[in-house]
Amino acid sequence: MSIRIKIDKLRQIVAYFSEFSEEVSINVDSTDELMYIFAALGGSVNIWAIIPLSASVFYRGAENIVFNLPVSKVKSCLCSFHNDAIIDIEPDLENNLVKLSSYHVVSVDCNKELMPIRTDTTICLSIDQKKSYVFNFHKYEEKCCGRTVIHLEWLLGFIKCISQHQHLTIMFKDDNIIMKTPGNTDAFSREYSMTECSQELQKFSFKIAISSLNKLRGFKKRVNVFETRIVMDNDDNILGMLFSDRVQSFKINIFMAFLD
């Protein structure tokens, strides 16, 4: 079982995720024809991309598969492949490896006769395959009780001014979401109108770590605004905030849990 992927698509993925983590977990769902890429950033922050299987990302297998990919190592070695290469990614779960392979054929004039010359490249990279994550992505899309749009650069400017604090209080009032620093002295507050806000939600307040919000800084060059949702599970437990956007050709989700 392997994934065949165009090198341009692989470059997008590894360039993006290597800014946040040295490795990611890849989950291929052959039934839904989707590939999920997941990384845990710490501090109750998870990031994942959802990529449809297509001509540029093709799965050669019938069963679902989960494996780890060392994105930092892959990013460093992609210069070994031709710019038009289609790369096979084949995990070796038993030996804690992942293999990248590709070939390229060029025609060379040899005594006025074109001769095909084939170049094969294979790279084996070590990575612990025993700790792959099976992440329930659908859990965070089951229910939404609040929705707004947040301009990333303005949010980053706001939290830069409050770096002396450890968390923000999240409140809801008059169909607005309010982010406020603790106390009344030297207090900062940011308010967003919401396109969706349940009446039940406006009875609660939560806390979110500023260190978690700071992890959005890695998106600064790629994202202008995030669709932001307050998400619940099927038992109506409010889980946290889900930031979503489409980056290049794939969808990105970042989930941040509210503090207890």
Swiss-Prot record:
Induction: Expressed in the intermediate phase of the viral replicative cycle. Pfam families: Pox_TAP. GO terms for biological process: regulation of DNA-templated transcription. It comes from the Viruses. Associates with RNA polymerase to initiate transcription from late gene promoters. Interacts with the late transcription factors VLTF-2 and VLTF-3. Interacts with the late transcription elongation factor VLTF-4. Interacts with itself. Belongs to the chordopoxvirinae VLTF-1 family. This is Late transcription factor 1.
